[in-house]
Amino acid sequence: MAERRDGLATKSHLLAAARRVFAEKGYRDATSGEICSAARANAASINYHFGSKEKLYAEVWKEAFQEAIDRYPLDGGLGADASAEARLKATVQSLLRRMLDSSSLGYAGQIVLMELANPTEALELVKQDVIEPLRRRMHAIVRELVGPKAAEEQVVFCAISIIHQCLGFGFKKGKLPAMLESLDKETLLVSLTEHIYRFSVGGIRAVRPQVNAAPHVRSGECVFRAEVG
């Protein structure tokens, strides 16, 4: 029984250490030796408990993002009958809370950005477990706000614009940009949520007249009509 408890503890330490090392270095540059050293485990521990570094990486993904879903659900606890505006604000706040979390969960945002910048075989797992649920939710919200005549590219552009405003805070594991470090984090989070929400709704309102005025335009073209004349 004691041996089993020790094994579970070692596995837990490896997952915690791997989350930090993968977040800081990415999958390719992180070494099994470094992870084992950080976990204070022997060099064979990863193969024993997970089978390989790749399988450990997959477990880190599953654990981190299940934790994110449990702690900060994308729907913010709202019912399905909530307005599109309310669902948008809840989703923005959920993403910001995940990115600005100063606990070990904050490493999850860094891992996402590392994976998107330097894709590995795990990218499919990222798409399935992290990106796809967010994409479906944000596209549904945006389409409801822009209107049924919107081309798919317009929905995609708006959704990406909103999401990346939130992801930009995920680079430093919960640490704020230097110019914002003196501010109370919870107060700032509320203000950021409101700002990104209002900024995004304003952008969608600016796109909506183009959608309604030019239903015949090829997909995506009307987004750029104002710039190119």
Model-based region annotation:
Residues K53, V60, A64, L88, ...:
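Hydrophobic/aromatic residues within well-ordered alpha-helical segments
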Residues P73-Y107, V155-A159:
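Hydrophobic alpha-helical connector segments
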Residues L113-P119:
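Short helix-capping/turn signature of helix-turn-helix
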